[in-house]
Amino acid sequence: MQDVATEAAKRRTFAIISHPDAGKTTLTEKLLYYGGAIQMAGSVKGRKSKAHATSDWMAMEQERGISVTSSVMQFPYRERILNLLDTPGHGDFSEDTYRTLTAVDSALMVIDIAKGVEERTVQLMDVCRMRDTPITTFINKLDRDGRDPVEVLDEVESVLRIRCAPVTWPLGMGRGFRGVYHLHLDQVRLFMDREIIQGLDNPRLDELFPGEVDEWREQIELVREASDSFDPEAYLAGQLTPVYFGSAVNDFGIRELLDDFVEHAPAPRSRDAGREVRADEENFTGFVFKIQANMDPQHRDRIAFLRVCSGRFEPGMKLYQVRTGKNMKIPRATTFMASDRSHAETAAPGDIIGIHNHGTIIIGDAFTEGESLHFTGIPDFAPELFRRVVLRDPMRMKALQKGLEQLCEEGATQLFRPLLGSDWIVGAVGTLQFDVAAYRLQKEYGVECTFEGVQVYTARWVSAEDEKALQRFRDRNESALAWDGTGALAYLAPTRANLELTQERWPDIRFLATRDR
């Protein structure tokens, strides 16, 4: 058995980020195909066929063709172990994506050549920048007509505030797409017959493309002069991104991307948990960044997704749950290949394992071999939309409660129980989350319900240094207070003016829009 440092050095744990429809799920499929994890890369566009994308495993995702939960997939490639976290492609699921990005060491950004930098990409890059996450860029859909590649790179640099270092460069696009030129290897890789031609000055190119090759040579000369060259240190600091061009749906340009990625992407990095936790430490540490209910609808299971930060996990280990102060025996854990699960024999730093959860584990929980650590930077955000749950059949109240509690544990929606009355209020970042909640409550828990408007503008978690001040605030504002799903007290403001006035009246109370788990 190899030591922890050796195993950690093999790992590459990363997420793919993009705006919806940039080709993220298709690229995911191709990466898994290259890693030997799947036999057939099923195009997502064939949704009516059985070849649904491997990473979109939930029924609703297969129907709508968007990723709404984060899947975890492990696969080997060139003596490395890659852990790929697929993030939701829909904007309403930004919290799930944010937490996923806390569990990775680098990210792969996908951009559509026709659309350039889009809104969702900007939001995700803001999150990556907060953690100086190294970014690799794949500019997709070169088989279709799009914008000038130079213009798109300028946009990436100005809007996303990261320097670009092209590694491959497109030769034409759309119907005139001939292939890519690899700037480091001085190779032309042809699109149609996949031939590799060594050297941009090779006479073979003049034979094949007499009317185009001179223009390519001129353009690549300009690109070499005007763009940054790849600098590993700047990349690891999150300041520079290597850029690759290709067509994911045609399986072109991906091998070049993957070959370089496993060489340059960082192995598991140190983590802040009150002290610096290094990946090569012998003792096990890890944190929960996601909870998913009903990955197997037949067994009503809940899985806590845990990122291993140091040491080694082995089945049967006793782990210390820092929040509760209790030891928990973990008889077995799960590794993931999208929905296909297998029991983990062992897990090393950088790996993601699934622990069966019966309601005792929450997002942000740290597990160690006895040390009290708190991994920082796993937040909750105040929801932006609120709805009251209306149950069709009052006899299903118990099932509704169980369903809401389990689904809200996952973190895409948040549950609030007002101190007065018997309402259930659900908060979310976007309207799609309510659709997903209603769909899953019906499919997985047999509960039919609707969500109707409620007079809540926003929620703020409340706390105070002085316990008596908090009790006074609670006594005077009971009708606007609620417990959230973790047992934290929240103020549900009916209007913006009300929130501002309440904050003025109660200067001793902290009103928090985000809070660390």
Swiss-Prot record:
Organism: Halorhodospira halophila (strain DSM 244 / SL1)
Residues annotated as binding GTP: 18-25, 86-90, 140-143
GO molecular function: GTP binding; GTPase activity; guanosine tetraphosphate binding; translation release factor activity, codon nonspecific; translation release factor activity, codon specific
Protein name, entry field: Peptide chain release factor 3
Subcellular location: Cytoplasm
Job of this protein: Increases the formation of ribosomal termination complexes and stimulates activities of RF-1 and RF-2. It binds guanine nucleotides and has strong preference for UGA stop codons. It may interact directly with the ribosome. The stimulation of RF-1 and RF-2 is significantly reduced by GTP and GDP, but not by GMP.
Superkingdom as given in the UniProt entry: Bacteria
Keywords, alphabetical: Cytoplasm, GTP-binding, Nucleotide-binding, Protein biosynthesis
Family assignment from sequence similarity: Belongs to the TRAFAC class translation factor GTPase superfamily. Classic translation factor GTPase family. PrfC subfamily.
Annotated GO CC locations: cytosol
Main location: cytoplasm
GO biological process, one term: regulation of translational termination
NCBIfam families with a match to the protein in the record: prfC (TIGR00503), PRK00741.1 (NF001964), small_GTP (TIGR00231)
PROSITE patterns linked to this entry: G_TR_1, G_TR_2
Record-linked SUPFAM superfamilies: EF-G C-terminal domain-like, P-loop containing nucleoside triphosphate hydrolases, Translation proteins
Residue span(s) of domain tr-type G: 9-269
Gene3D superfamilies found in the cross-reference section: P-loop containing nucleotide triphosphate hydrolases, Peptide chain release factor 3, domain III
